[in-house]
Amino acid sequence: MSRWLWPWSNCVKERVCRYLLQHYLGHFFQEHLSLDQLSLDLYKGSVALRDIHLETWSVNEFLRSMESPLELVEGFVSSIEVAVPWAALLTDHCTVCVSGLQLTLQPRQGSGPGAADSQSWASCMTTSLQLAQECLREGLPEPSEPPQPLEGLEMFAQTIETVLRRIKVTFLNTVVRVEHSLGDEDRSVAVEVRVQRLEYCDEAVRDPSQAPPVDVHQPPAFLHKLLQLSGVCLYFEELPSQADPPQPPLQIGSCTGYVELMVRLKQNEAFPGPKLEVSGQLGSLHLLLTPRQLQQLQRLLSAVNLADPAGLADKLNKSRPLGAEDLWLIEQDLNQQLQAGAVAESLSLYPITNPLNLDSTDLFFSMAGLTSSVTSAVSELSVYSVDLGSSVHSNMAFHRPSTPPHSGGKMAPTPLLDTTRPDSLVKMTLGGVSLTLLQTASPSSGPSDLPTHFFAEFDAAKDGPFGSRDFSHLRPRFQRACPCSHVRLTGTAVQLSWELRTGSHSRRTSSTEVHFGQLEVLECLWPRAATEPEYTEILSFPSHSGSEASARPCAHLRHTQTIRRVLKSRSRRSTACHCHSELSLDLADFQSDVELGSLDRLAALFRQVTTPSEPPAGLLTEPPQATELQTVFRLSAPRATLRLRFPIPDLRPDRDPWAGQAVRAEQLRLELSEPQFRSELNSGPGPPAPTRLELTCSDLQGIYEDGEKPPVPCLRVSKALNPRSTEAKYFLPQVVVTLNPQSSGTQWETAYEKGRDLELSTESPCELQQPEPSPFSSKRTMYETEEMVIPGDPEEMRTFQSRTLALSRCTLDVIMPSAHIFLPSKEVYESIYNRINNDLLMWEPADLLPTSSAAARPPGSSGFKMCKSAFKLDSDSDEEDAQFFSMASGVPQTPAPEPSRRQSQSTFSTLVTVLKGRITALCEAKDETGKRLDVTHGELVLDVEQGTIFSVAQYRGQPGLGYFCLEAEKAKLYHRAAIEDYLLPTHLEVPSFAPPAQLAPTIYPSEEGVTERGTLGRKGQGPPMLSAAVRIHLDPHKNVKEFLVTVRLHKATLRHYMAPPEQSWHSQLLDFLDVLDDPVLGYLPPTVITVLHTHLFSCAVDYRPLYLPVRVLVTAETFTLSSNIVMDTSTFLLRFILDDSALYLSDKCEVESLDLRRDYVCVLDIDLLELVIKTWKGSTEGRLSQPLFELRCSNNVVHVHSCADSCALLVNLLQYLTSSGDLHPPPRPPSPTEIAGQKLSESPASLPSCLPVETALINQRDLTDALLDTERRGLQELAQSSGGPLPQASPVSVYLFPGERSGAQAPLPPPGASSHTLGSKAKEHENEEEGDGDTLDSDEFCILDAPGLGIAPRDGEPIVTQLHPGPIIVHDGHFSQPLGSTDLLRAPAHFPVPSSRVVLREVSFIWHLYGGRDFGLHPTYRARVGLTGPRVSPSRSSGPNRPQNSWRTQGGIGRQHQVLMEIQLSKVSFQHEVYPEESAIAGGLGQELDERPLSRQVLIVQELEIRDRLATSKINKFLHLHTSERLPRRTHSNMLTIKALHVAPTSSVGGPECCLRVSMMPLRLNVDQDALFFLKDFFTSLAASINPMVPGDTSEAPRETHSRPGSPQEGQSEDTETASNPPEAPGSSHSSSDQQPIYFREFRFTSEVPICLDYHGKHVTVDQVGTFMGLLIGLAQLNCSELKLKRLCCRHGLLGVDKVLCYALNEWLQDIRKNQLPGLLGGVGPMHSVVQLFQGFRDLLWLPIEQYRKDGRLIRGLQRGAASFGSSTASAALELSNRLVQAIQATAETVYDILSPASPVSRSLQDKRSSRKLRRGQQPADLREGMAKAYDAVREGILDTAQTICDVASRGHEQKGLTGAVGGVIRQLPPTVVKPIIVATEATSNVLGGMRNQILPDAHKDHALKWRLEEAQD
């Protein structure tokens, strides 16, 4: 090298400099440089060029050769200075200084670049040897002969190479500007990159020692270039139109610090590594953008497409031959098609999802398609995933690999080696990055020149803004730099890596990786007129801040994009290429604030940033070839903390959306373990695919934070083991959001719908369409005229949910494998309820970007469908017609005028699935007074299995319509009223779902033995245990929201626990759920109307008393509850329908689980029962217009099946329930010593005060007479002193009740029973009942007096008494005509409106009384109990058992079904009314009533029957209504009527007084001796088994409101009562003031009741009733004995119901003994017929005389006498004759039985006799039927005799031959002689009976009612 250091000549220097400039830069200049144009300073070695304009075409050709996406528009260079150190050329470097370089570029139009050759970057650098040769030859004259090689040419080339390596280029004040026109708009945008200084040199300049040796023949494999930049700034300019003045560009970014880039170029392909590698370092990068700027930048970058897929496909598709790998793939695909069956079968079991949507048919031109070859797509994936790295040369040969052996019948394809090679690699390290994105385009707050102020703030920092490990110190600086609302991304220690790989198969892959040492994403909101901003941490990493920051990056972003070609020749696609992108984000433990206002602002920001897609020019324009894009996004982190902030909803129209964060102090912190988020976005030709966002985690914890209060763990969701998987896989918590798109109305869709309409128009109009899916059952269930709404079955629910999810714009699917919700108090629940229900759900997004409708609607959005016919609006072709909220445009598209509701899209659907869940609620524990208990709380736990919650809003595009569904396969409720407080858990554990130890099961699935009906079908096919469906409809015009709620509970059991009202599970649950709604600004709550339908199927109530040895089970096959609930209304209606229910009792209390049919006894069976409850809040005036509470009940029949012990147990249970037995433990039974001592200390005063009835009545009357005068004198003195009227005396004041002192002043007696008092009116109101015994109430007629009625004279002549002289004047309309039928239960009109009313209408009861016992330990003993013994007739004791109609009537094993009686009360009506207090009715009644009514009861029994079903009795009806011609049955008559009126006493002391009135219809008694004794024994055993009412602890038992006279009243204090009572002995019983008997001030039996009695004695019984009574009972026979129950009226007062019964029985018995013995004895034996016989003769003679004396009509008297003689005498004679004939018949039958031989009778003959006996028991209805029966009897008798003789002869002949036959006939002769007598008497009896029944039809009817048919008995 040293020999080249001679002095350079000027010629050489000029040639070298000119050549260098011309060679490198000449073709870029507009003028060509020559030696004359150079101005050289040869001594200093410098050259300068100024004001150079670049040649645009040459530069663009150079850029096009490099496949650059940009082209030059204009270029200018201020100056170019080149300095060459000639003196030290080989040791010093040459410098090129370019000042004022300005380049204006724009995106290049035309096909984009393909895989650029990286050598083009160095194509301008030719070899130094060529350069030396051209340099020396240029300018010399052409030689005449070939030139000779220059000596030292290689040495000169080596020198040039050395000089070129040491060139240093410096760019000063460089401006690179990229402009882009925005489509059809006038405006354009420009981005400028301003670089103050850029130095470019070779790596040898910095470190000459690392430079490789110079070799002119072998260039180096890699070139290393160094770029150093400083003062880099980014500017953005929006070029205005020509009319607008230009604006200076705005700075949007700056690079602070030192920027250094190392460029590594590979010149030899044999070496591994990328062709171009750039690595650099950057201090910090700050960006400040507005949404519009970011949008324009996106459009600019999209225009500058670095990898245009169309160009790539065009370039790579040109003349590409089939290579070895293509032929191999073809062969593989052919092999797979041959095995398509096996592959398809395997893939059907394990489907393979193709995340890249790669289609192997796109690889070749020659293949039609590999549609069924999924494996080929998988093989292609494997091919594309192979990375050869840097060890494979580009010219390697491909060989087909060897085929592996077959395994399992299938061949796995061998992956093909990939040919992708690294092309470019960029690695950057940034000290810090900050991106500040303003939320508004023109912020109102902040300085006017915000960019200048912003970047000046950061340029002032000398040490850089990212000096600390956290970002807390940056917030004040950003507050000063940008005082306006923005979103900021800040990151430090950023490492950026980008790699581009290209290869065969027209595929290019680019991958980008970004690592953040620290990262923070903030929203900084500046409210108006605020000095401090409000921060929302969108993404932060608290664990990576501070001194303990980890070296591991907090965020790792990976982005991989693969582009491959798609053939254009395929007609089914219009895509030019397929682009698949994967974006993966790995985060460290992070936290994020989730606030709806911030999300709304971010969404608005996103809508501003995103570029709307350009619509096609027209409908018939062919769409351009689109790119099929598929983007997969994944996010994962070890832990995540989401802080959900609850917004403050503001629905006012004039609210300020930028007023700041309107959030509550409460927040919900969600801690997720191992969260993973995945989303996939697809775009391209064809219908748009739905977007799916999926979030999974292994564990989720929710902590509710309320300000300064301690945090409350309220939610825990964890994974659960999958029981169906053998690999122990888990179900993970999952949240999936699916965004379904809306297809636009294109020409193809319009054509399809047109054809669809033509197809549908030809359908038959009679064809039924498929019903629309609904959550309600399609099976119509009607009750009366109302349709019962029932939730749908599981299939209907699934159909509705799947269809709704498919037709929803947005769906949310949440899966919770194991969930636990914990609510520690009602306050926390109320807070959470208001935060979620009133804040989250009521929040609405603000109008952040107000735009006009014309600008918001994209062109072409209103498709051609607006002209579509409405003929078939419900067809399936309108599925995509619904309006849809576009994520790209952010503007809801305008819907069609009348969209099809059937195919319109719903707005939002939610499906929450809980495999196992538990809700724990801690509620308040209160005592009986409602006061909260300290240190205790109640607890409720609800467990759910396989539960689903489904909700849809704006169903099918209807704004006010929504549905809500709830299902649970199993549900269990546990409860405990009071538990001691314990420490609340700091975090929730995963529940084990075992029953809580301290809680009792309350509602749970019914056990197998409890349900009556088994599960139909296989297991799991039945309906779920709990299902609910709610329909929500809001009418915005009326502001009315209607809820249709249906609930179904299937096979559930309620365990009933008796508790105080405030401690029951339902009261605590309702109190816990009764929360107040916080008001919402700008929201007017609508009027809510709720229609509730609750259905319980196959449910039960299990009750186990604590102190009663019985277990109770109530089952109901169907229980329906319907209600209409309207807010702010005074009326509430509730209806219950109970169908097929029963009550069971069991005495097996020690067994936990029982079987219904084996261990229980059904005692109550209800067929259908309806209850209607109506409540009224009352009026504001305080007056009642209707009852505050009204209960109405009606049913068809109630069956009671009981023996004496089960009935007594039922009565004891009712007493136990009414007295709240579980709450009051029974007293300890006294020991025998205490009992003996108590008996010795008893005094006469302590003896029972229950005296005989006669003695009590005598004492009563004596006391009344003795004290009457004294009382009158005292009242007269009192009235004279007070000046008031003199009241009449009442005998009620003579009693001294317990609790009154003997020396106390007698209380004031009530006013007498004057004609205007309420009591008198109540009595006289029903005087009409005394006349005929019929209860006919009238609300308008009130008979006050009937003057003139006196004692009739003895001759019976009526005497007319003249009351008013003169004519009688009739006033028309004086009495109002009643409207409709009269309500017998209604109170008179002058009564006040009751405050409560209970009504039972037409309820029927049937009481089945069985013999034996249902419970007990000795079944053999129970079988002997009953009528077995001397009472049973030997001839009837062997009767068969009665058949069982149902298993419910089986009862216990000791029940005797052959011993049965039935008591039936048909159409029972009852009404109980309670009247308000005196203050409530005083204003309404005034002085009309002197007595205040308290309550009124009415009981009406339309029909009362007692049926005899004993096997030993022939009686049919034991008791029934007696009707005859003299007493016909009235149409609306009631058999029994009882009316009771309770009034308040006029005195201050005493309880309510009752006026009782009873009326009854005539009775007919058919008494069998066995039935009578059974009833006696039954009720005796029943009375003995009923436990007496034992009062509990008076300190715990609540006092009754009403008590008998003498008890303290409500307003009287307990101290007064205690002072008035003497102290009792410790062993004495409690005072009976708590349970006072009713005091009856008046008792009236208003009607005289005739009774017709028949009695049939069977056997003498002397062991119980004595000898005489036993003989009398056993031998007595009564027929039509007549009795009468006389009218009763007792006004002396009776205390207790027992006294009333004793009084009535005593009066009737005395009357019967004194006056009715003749009528009773007239029925003994045949006396009734004899009496009738003589009565007929008497009437025949006496009636004409009586009629003549009365009115002189003798003929009328003769007619009456003849009619009476005919009906009485003739019927009596026939009856007597029939009795005589029957007696002869009985005697003949006895003789026949004696004379008949003992030979057996054939079976056929026995059957014939039994059938004749059945027909014989039925009396003929008339003479014709009697003659027919007589003929049949004679004919059958003759045939029977002949058949008997033939049978005897044949049997004797078989046994002994002819002798035996003759002997048998001779033995049969005596009974044969007697047989005609029997037949004749039977025929005669039939004829006489027919004649009697024809004369007297009532006799036949009475016979049919009295005697039981033999068929019914058997």
UniProtKB/Swiss-Prot annotation:
Main location: membrane
Keyword Calcium among UniProt keywords: no
Comp. bias intervals (Low complexity): 1429-1446
Region (Disordered): 1222-1243, 1299-1337, 1427-1452, 1589-1634, 1803-1822
UniProt keyword DNA damage, yes or no: no
InterPro entries for the chain: ATG2 (IPR026849)
Biased composition (Acidic residues): 1327-1337
The name this protein goes by in its record: Autophagy-related protein 2 homolog A
Organism from which the protein derives: Mus musculus (Mouse)
Gene: Atg2a
